[in-house]
Amino acid sequence: MKRTIIMMLDSFGVGASADAASFGDVGSDTFGHIAKACAEGKADIGREGPLKLPNLARLGLGHAAMESTGAFAPGFGDNVELIGAYGHAQELSSGKDTPSGHWEMAGVPVLFEWGYFSEHQNSFPKELTDKILARAGLDGFLGNCHASGTTILEELGEEHMRSGKPIFYTSADSVFQIACHEETFGLDNLYRLCEITREELEPYNIGRVIARPFDGTGPSDFARTGNRKDYSLEPPAKTVLDKLKEAGGEVVSVGKIADIYAYCGITKKVKANGLEALFDATLAEVKSAGDNTIVFTNFVDFDSHYGHRRDVAGYAKGLEYFDARLPEMLALLGEDDLLILTADHGCDPTWQGTDHTREYVPVLAFGAGLKAGSLGRRKSFADIGQSIASHFKLEPMAYGESFL
């Protein structure tokens, strides 16, 4: 029985990539800087001491990062019995955003330029927002700027609840984000507003519209809920997910995977929110998955809760939780199963600002006859998609080289 399990640690980069200068990210290193902060006692909130990831280390994380940066991260070294194949991958796509990383790892790099709202204030064209408001029957909106999703709730959440005006904001990514209170504005109303916005954005080539529902009564307790929804463009070509589905296989999305691929190539969607629930759901799906199945999980908390919020201790604690549960996953794997752990970009919690960082990502692979050892530097995330195509004996992808 052949299956592939992809555990995507959203934003878990392993060092600045060769083209990081083009993104202002030279010196960024999500994994390395977290390990350094832990070793120096600077990440002892909710946890303490050096970063402890023994299971990821056995799968080759420390070695993959060493090959990426030229040095082992603090607390990691050669004194580990490797069981997995490890490498690090360069992104071929033009951006450091979520859709680009995900589509590329499924065999379809983004070789065009996304549209962006680059102005930090008055970010959106009036012509665009006028059309959105008219179609939605709204008399105004708040925000219209680059912002941290949590900060903008503190600043504008109460005014939003009083006025009923949605909060529009963006970032360095190709994204249009809309924050609304689940009770006073309504979740269905927010989703409908996002659908309208997605349609009106067609000429702008924006990668995603994101619904950002929140609850609470004031700045001290406003919090995003688990009902986020992404409205992505469809990938520009068939991914390996599409090809497996067309061949009669199953593709199970856990978390936000289905949204990122605009449901293309997905046969089942499982909703889960938070690291624990995402891990539980992944294990449950692997237990029930049959032959020719991909189980694909995005562990979004690493990015949304820790990377963007520049929470080093939280990121470290999350990694240690994930690592402690990995043996549960390994115990479920059959001889012909392929387990892949990777990331879609970096989001160094020690870096300036709140945006993603252009980094190499780890490629940790286990099973399917792979021998423990180095896979080297992969020229594209698409090597993952090509390897999955090879694993299932599908038609080769146009991009990528298999490491199987």
UniProtKB/Swiss-Prot annotation:
Catalytic reaction equation(s): 2-deoxy-alpha-D-ribose 1-phosphate = 2-deoxy-D-ribose 5-phosphate; alpha-D-ribose 1-phosphate = D-ribose 5-phosphate
Residues that, per the record, bind Mn(2+) 2: D303, H308, H356
Superkingdom of origin: Bacteria
List of residues binding Mn(2+) 1: D10, D344, H345
Keywords recorded for this protein, A-Z: Cytoplasm, Isomerase, Manganese, Metal-binding
Alphabetized SUPFAM superfamilies for the sequence: Alkaline phosphatase-like, DeoB insert domain-like
Any GO molecular function: phosphopentomutase activity
Any Gene Ontology biological process: nucleotide metabolic process
UniProt cross-references to Pfam families, sorted A to Z: Metalloenzyme
Enzyme Commission numbers on file: 5.4.2.7
SS bond partners: none
GO cellular component terms listed in the entry, alphabetical order: cytosol
Cofactor binding description: Binds 2 manganese ions.
InterPro entries tied to this protein: Alkaline_phosphatase_core_sf, DeoB, Metalloenzyme, Phosphopentomutase_DeoB_cap_sf
Localization (cell): Cytoplasm
Cofactor(s) required for function per UniProt: Mn(2+)
Pathway assignment: Carbohydrate degradation; 2-deoxy-D-ribose 1-phosphate degradation; D-glyceraldehyde 3-phosphate and acetaldehyde from 2-deoxy-alpha-D-ribose 1-phosphate: step 1/2
HAMAP family registered for this protein in UniProt: Phosphopentomut
Classification via PANTHER family: PHOSPHOPENTOMUTASE (PTHR21110:SF0)
Recorded family membership: Belongs to the phosphopentomutase family.
Functional note: Isomerase that catalyzes the conversion of deoxy-ribose 1-phosphate (dRib-1-P) and ribose 1-phosphate (Rib-1-P) to deoxy-ribose 5-phosphate (dRib-5-P) and ribose 5-phosphate (Rib-5-P), respectively.
Protein name: Phosphopentomutase
Source organism of this protein record: Shewanella baltica (strain OS185)
Encoding gene (name): deoB
